[in-house]
Amino acid sequence: MALLNRRWTGCVLGVAMFVGWTAAISADAVHNDGHEFDFEFGTWKTHVSMLKQPLTGSKTWAEYDGITIVHKVWNGQANLVDLDMKNASSHLKLASFRLFNPATHQWSLYVANSHSGTLGVPSIGGFADGRGVFYDKETFDGKLVTVRFVITPRSADAIHFEQAFSADDGKTWETNWIADDTRVKDR
């Protein structure tokens, strides 16, 4: 089970093998300016639901609670996310480094976890119509899958995240990661 958790957290947010796949959101379709994540800076209470066995038909989820801290870097042109979450049987730490590319007007989201100690390849995309959508390709359980990661701000104090895998190049999707963040207000 520990090996499964290490392997799963290593790929859960798009951290496995990138296969030169271009994001579905092109630079022409989305004109980001490098401040799309400004709404997220600060500390958040996080609840995560993670599908235990993606792409198997399983409906068994693991639930985690934790804290996310989002730090501004380079005046907002980058940011660092520190997620620390646990449940009764597992403790997971993830870090995400998000970089804005001014030439393409897209963001690259790199993720690492404390179990593997490695930085994965990026999910690439941007924000349009009030939500961020990011894509990559990676290998999961020996199969090449398309990964979609969606960030939806619901208010100034609430954000919803979803990750889904597609084993058929985006025809169908299975959501395998759901996170809801609530801002921790200064006292």
Model-derived features: where do they sit?
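Bacterial N-terminal signal peptides
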Residues: 11-21
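Short stretches within intrinsically disordered, low-complexity N-terminal or propeptide regions
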Residues: 4, 18, 25-26
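Bacterial N-terminal signal peptides that target proteins for export
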Residues: 1-12
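Hydrophobic small-molecule pocket/channel-lining residues, especially in calycin-type beta-barrels
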Residues: 24-187
